Amino acid sequence: MQRHSTLASTAVLLSSLLCAAVAHGQMDDKYQPNAESKKYPEGSSIERRTRMAAIAANPAYTRKFDLSGLPDYKPEGHPTGILRICGNNYIGDSPLGGWWKDAFEKLQPGITIQYDLQTAATAIPCLAFDKADIGITHEPSFYDYLSYQRLKGHTPTGITILTGSYDVVGWQNNMVIVVNKANPLTKISMTQLDGIFGSQRAGGWIATTWHPEFARGPERDIRTWGQLGVTGPLADKPIDTYGYSLRYATALEFSDKVLHSTDKWNENFLGFGNYTKPDGKTYLEADQIVDHVRDDPNGIGYVRYHPKFPTDIKILDVAETDAGPFVHYSMDTLQDHSYPLWGGQSFWIDIVPGRPVDPKIREFTRFVLSRQGQELLQKDGKYLPLDAATVQEGLKTLR
């Protein structure tokens, strides 16, 4: 009887500790299902739109970046017809999509923009099956690329049109690397992240092309803190890795940026997904990652930054190479793309080798990349505007 009593007491204690940790790491309640959103099927486009309506309607930042280095939009032709755009629901849920449409149609009255912005998951399929002229999404998955190539004979072309948000959940809030507050480490390189989160591999991918030159052996694995230069009691301790379930786009983005788009992860990696707790609240994957790193002195995780991000874990500065420079996560370093883990959204279009880009697509993309287009994005106040170098890179793709 004493044993059962002890076990019961232990269970209650553990449950209390877990609840405290969950509450401490919980994101703002405005991201939780509400009375109105619960009227619709969980996870549906309309449920998500209803749940995020208040966030979508208002700017999250009011600062103004210097966009004087971006080109003014000047029409280079006046094509006519309907321009069909599919994908990213957050552009349609916020005022941004409407602002872009209204401003562009005044400058190009012969073009009518027709949106179908329900989810980024449909962007590449719509493009592949000729249901759209532009798909708006992040980097496609391997099977998005593959299905497109099977149908079209080539892969879609992406042109970056915006930078993900600093901390607005849904608007591609960007990734940070976190460790336990007691960890003395302050910085990490992309090469070291590969060693920590990855494992031996035979190669890697760019779209649907396999690259054996991305191979690496087990000697580049980093499995203890001492391998990162940490001294003291932590030096010989194993590194415990945390992040998103490998079925999430965030895990694919991290793999694309750090692991050469492979599926070879550290054998101790724990990935998390959203689930509904008994109280009806969603325990978000980001909160689970943060809670595990907070409670594990040996832990490191990648996680999307969000409002009310806890102060009792440490965010590491990140560099492209071991030599640096190591860059702090901030709105400025995201916007100028000096932070190595920055992410964005792209217009994905069909460019047939040897043929010009559809003039309707070309003109609208030029408008979005222009100072006028990026000023509207900045006015919306969630996504961050592009820097001049990224804009010029996109314009070159259209030529």
Each language-model region and where it sits:
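Flexible loop/hinge segments at secondary-structure junctions
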Residues: 26-399
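Boundary at the C-terminal end of the N-terminal hydrophobic targeting segment
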Residues: 21-25
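Bacterial N-terminal signal peptides
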Residues: 10-20
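Bacterial N-terminal signal peptides that target proteins for export
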Residues: 2-11
